UniProtKB/Swiss-Prot annotation:
Protein name: tRNA N6-adenosine threonylcarbamoyltransferase
Gene behind the chain: tsaD
List of residues binding Fe cation: H111, H115, D305
Subcellular location per the Swiss-Prot or TrEMBL entry: Cytoplasm
Binding annotation for substrate: L134, I135, S136, G137, G138, D167, G180, N277
Keywords: Acyltransferase, Cytoplasm, Iron, Metal-binding, Transferase, tRNA processing
GO terms of biological process kind: tRNA threonylcarbamoyladenosine modification
PANTHER family xrefs: TRNA N6-ADENOSINE THREONYLCARBAMOYLTRANSFERASE (PTHR11735), TRNA N6-ADENOSINE THREONYLCARBAMOYLTRANSFERASE, MITOCHONDRIAL (PTHR11735:SF6)
E.C. number: 2.3.1.234
Lineage: superkingdom: Bacteria
Lineage of producing organism: Bacteria, Pseudomonadati, Pseudomonadota, Gammaproteobacteria, Pasteurellales
């Protein structure tokens, strides 16, 4: 079985082909970061229009990369949510039209389930059950995963997601979009403990997150450090970035440890854009070693949005006979807990 995957939920156009026998055989990606940089963030209308321009050429490029024709595709998977409604509709419409024209089944895939499945594309994939930390610009969730579709939300952000807090704080530091990535690079040059940020919601029971207060704390710290010209010196910027990142990482470590101890699980899967953060990876690895457990995450190119994770997730579900009807429907808000469970599917 060969599945074409299409991802258009936000500002990346991703197309990939997953082959049951050979694994991932094509992966094409176009990022809109440069286009949105002038605006300091994603402009939904521009994102949608660019997906219209790029999706079909990327499908053609993926088929060429895999040395396949359309007649050799057995199904199409597409991101149907959560995400920007206009961007989602582009991918969904193209996927549904191609599935009808090629006479193959189509499947609407949950974007965050795609991220959750991304580590399955690696050489040493995790086995169920495990705790999943989904951490991106739009989501920060701790999920108990018993199998495909068997999800229990243990905790999530009650305000800003971690990635959103990174981006907003980076912007306060005068960094260009995407500011979160630039903040992490700045933090590497920071002096530890010059500034100490709070670790929100770690002084009480529970697994929920709150990151909006860290952004406010950063703003107040920045304002207190401005010189007479209203500027921050470079080392102070690095030190504030370091303190902010350390607070986020510490908070996540504490919550992950609680989730593992609460469930008795020994495997942790981390996925989503922020899962590429070097410090977070290093400290989670140290924590899991102390707990005699193991942490799994996708390679950096599959941390951000991509078509490979959608193609793979679509393959798993289409193989079990799941499919979507002919209607073009997207879900900008879509709880993962409503997804169909694939019974007794404990190894993929």
């Amino acid at each position: 079985m060969r599945i074409l995957g299409i991802e258009t939920s936000c500002d990346e156009t991703g197309v990939a082909i997953y082959d049951e026998q050979r694994g991932l055989i094509a992966n094409q990606l176009y990022s809109q970061i440069e286009m949105h940089a002038d605006y300091g963030g994603v402009v939904p209308e521009l994102a949608s229009r660019d997906h219209i321009r790029k999706t079909l050429p990327l499908i053609q490029a993926a088929l060429k990369e895999a040395n396949l024709t359309a007649s050799e595709i057995d199904g199409i998977a597409y991101t149907a949510g959560p995400g920007l409604v206009g961007a989602l509709l582009v991918g969904a419409t193209i996927a549904r039209a191609l599935a009808y024209a090629w006479n193959v089944p189509a499947l609407a895939v949950h974007h965050m389930e795609g991220h959750l499945m991304a580590p399955m594309l690696e050489e040493n994939p995790p086995e169920f059950p495990f705790i999943a930390l989904l951490i991106s610009g739009g989501h920060t969730q701790l999920i108990k995963v018993a199998g495909v579709g068997e999800y229990e939300i243990l905790g999530e952000s009650i305000d800003d997601a971690a990635g959103e807090a990174f981006d907003k704080t980076g912007k306060l530091l005068g960094l260009d979009y995407p500011a979160g990535v630039a903040l992490s690079q700045l933090a590497e040059k920071g002096t530890p403990n010059r500034f100490v940020f709070p670790r929100p919601m770690t002084d009480r029971p529970g697994l929920d997150f709150s990151f909006s207060g860290l952004k406010t704390f950063a703003a107040n710290t920045i304002n207190a450090q401005l010189d007479e010209n209203g500027q921050l010196n470079e080392q102070t910027r690095c030190d504030i970035a370091h303190a902010f990142q350390q607070a986020v990482v510490d908070t996540i470590i504490i919550k992950c440890k609680r989730a593992l101890q609460q469930t008795g699980y020994s495997r942790l899967v981390m996925a989503g854009g922020v899962s590429a953060n070097k410090q977070l990876r290093a400290e989670l690895a140290t924590m899991m070693q102390a707990l005699k457990g193991q942490v799994y995450y996708p390679r950096p190119q599959f941390c951000t949005d991509n078509g490979a994770m959608i193609a793979y997730t679509g393959f798993i579900r289409l193989k079990k006979g799941e499919k979507t009807d002919l209607s073009v429907s997207v879900k900008p808000r879509w709880p993962m807990t409503t997804l169909l469970k694939l019974s007794a599917h404990h190894k993929v």
